[in-house]
A protein has these predicted regions:
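N-terminal (or domain-start) structured segment
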Residues: 28-119, 157-158, 167-168, 180-204, ...
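Extracytoplasmic/secreted proteins, especially bacterial periplasmic and envelope-associated proteins
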Residues: 51, 55, 59, 80, ...
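Bacterial N-terminal signal peptides
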Residues: 10-22
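N-terminal secretory signal peptides that target proteins for export/translocation
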Residues: 1-6
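An extracytoplasmic/periplasmic, membrane-proximal ligand-sensing/linker region
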Residues: 34-36, 178, 218, 265-326
């Protein structure tokens, strides 16, 4: 015969199990998103990617009805951020704004990759392009790419270029290779500290994204000589292209939203739709354009195909520049 206390314990346990089941079911059926989303960035605060992402994410959070928490994880050419997101739960609450650095260039720059740029991620939406530009310390007596090349050839090994991303590394190495220059490479963890040393005159030049470098150019702390894209930048129409002097030079930095592999399709569809709505707003396009970003987006499938294409593009760039894996 079961005692009363045992019966009560059994009933309580049964009730607890039923309650837990109901809670679990309710949680599973809760509409996405039901809590804040963490958005991981592979670069430090103050970088071009950070500045443009904060504009987009503020509006995205309003549209989704939750907070978007920006988490900057610079280091190892963006690998720290990419690895963190790749290992996160595919529930839509840990996302990443990536660029060509972690997802296009690193596989050909790093010997020990800690993630697969395709298999470990779910493409959500491309968010645009960020042109890079060549900037130099104002004390360097050159006002064009041709004049800078002449100076560097006159004194081989004297001039250096800083880098805070894979795009900057590849741009500098491509410049040296195509122009036949002996330049010292000085790598940094991210662009802001590299920029600080360039302004202080501790390095000679740098390829930097327009949003990060433009304020310093406008303040006369740096001189801008050219943009890295095939076409001139709408924001800096007076700047020539690198290709105008160094034939074959064409490097663009892209941005896009990704999550861990195997994210539910309905969550990806929702995020993609809201991101694209943000980009359709003229005020947002204007804010991003003022920071040097050409904003546009498309379906997840289009972004997935683009990611694979960019691996081919950056493999060619890196091999052409003669850069070996480190």
């Amino acid at each position: 015969m079961i005692s009363l206390s045992t019966q009560r314990l059994g009933a309580a346990a049964a009730f607890a199990m039923i309650f837990a089941g109901l809670t679990s079911a309710a949680s599973a059926q809760a509409p996405y998103p039901s809590r804040n989303i963490t958005l991981v960035l592979p670069f430090a605060a103050g970088s071009g990617t950070d500045a443009t992402t904060r504009i987009i994410s503020r509006e995205l959070g309003i549209a989704l009805g939750v907070g978007i928490v920006i988490e900057n994880k610079p280091g190892a050419n963006g690998s720290l951020a990419a690895s963190h997101v790749a290992r996160s739960a595919p529930d839509g609450y840990t996302l990443m704004v990536s660029t060509n650095t972690p997802h296009s260039a690193n596989p050909y720059l790093m010997k020990n990759m800690t993630y697969d740029p395709i298999k470990d991620f779910t493409p959500i939406a491309r968010s645009g392009d960020l042109p890079f530009m060549l900037v130099i310390h104002p004390d360097i007596p050159a006002n064009s790419v041709a004049e800078l090349i002449a100076l560097a050839k006159k004194e081989p090994g004297k001039y250096s270029f800083a880098s805070g991303s894979s795009a900057a590394i590849v741009s500098g190495a491509t410049f040296a290779s195509l122009a036949g220059l002996d330049l010292l490479h000085v790598p940094y963890k991210s662009s802001p500290p590299a920029l600080t040393d360039l302004i202080a005159g501790r390095v000679s030049m740098m390829f930097i994204d327009v949003p990060t470098g433009l304020p310093h150019v406008n303040a006369k702390a740096l001189k801008a000589l050219a943009v890295t894209t095939k076409q001139r930048s709408a924001l800096l129409p007076e700047l020539p292209t690198m290709d105008a002097t160094v034939k074959g030079f064409d490097i663009t930095s892209w941005q896009g939203y990704l999550g861990p592999a195997n994210m539910p399709k309905d969550i990806v569809t929702r995020l993609n739709a809201e991101i694209r709505k943000v980009f359709e707003r003229p005020d947002i396009k204007g804010q991003l354009a003022n920071r040097g970003m050409e904003a546009f987006s498309g379906p997840p499938e289009e972004f997935a195909a683009f990611l694979k294409e960019q691996l081919v593009v950056w493999e060619k760039l890196i091999k052409g520049a003669g850069i070996e894996k480190q």
